Regions:
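Amphipathic alpha-helical interaction segments
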Residues: 42-46, 80-83, 106
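Basic amphipathic alpha-helical segments that dock to polyanions
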Residues: 69-80
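Intrinsically disordered, low-complexity, basic-enriched segments
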Residues: 4-6, 10-11, 45, 59, ...
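Exposed, interaction-prone assembly regions rather than primary DNA-binding/catalytic cores
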Residues: 107-156
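Accessory beta->alpha helical hairpin/"wing" motif in late/C-terminal subdomains of nucleic-acid enzymes
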Residues: 84-110, 114-119
Length: 156
């Protein structure tokens, strides 16, 4: 792995932060893709200062993000940073028993801001269903990427 940016490792660590903030909720991949955007570009949704520079057409960076997030979740689940459960309605992710230890080991300004942003996302959008998130982001006229298919999701 030559580049840590936008890698499964970076996405996996970000998912640990997000899932710890959402705990004890269990969420599916599609919801995590939305919530990850909300955590990184929180200012777009009326939240704290965005973690990353809100460049024009930033939705284009999400074209392959869903796959990277999924690989990051797999990477983090192999070490119990993230738990994976499934039932007849789908696959769900939640904070794993080793998640708090990982977050506790990572220091620095970015990590503190990431935690603050993830906690804001959890408070404001953690209980939203997928259709509520679709409506919110459509209403805000955000430029999303190709990973958000026009698939209609029933329920959450």
């Amino acid at each position: 792995m030559n580049n840590i940016f936008n890698s499964p490792l970076e996405m996996g660590v970000r998912m640990v932060y997000l899932l710890l903030s959402l705990y004890p909720r269990k969420v599916d991949l599609q919801k995590l893709v939305y919530l990850e955007y909300a955590a990184v570009y929180s200012e777009d949704l009326g939240g704290p200062t965005s973690l990353h520079t809100p460049v024009p057409m930033r939705g284009g960076e999400h074209i392959s993000k869903r796959d990277i997030i999924e690989r990051g979740l797999h990477l983090m689940s192999a070490r119990s940073f993230i738990d994976v459960t499934y039932d007849s309605t789908g696959i769900y992710y939640s904070a794993g028993e080793n998640g708090p230890a990982l977050v506790g080991l990572i220091g620095g300004t970015y990590a503190s801001q990431l935690l603050m942003s993830c906690e804001w996302v959890a408070r404001n959008f953690g209980d939203f269903g997928i259709n509520e998130l679709l409506f919110l982001f459509d209403k805000k006229s955000l430029t999303w990427g190709a990973e958000f298919s026009p698939l209609e999701v029933k329920g959450n």
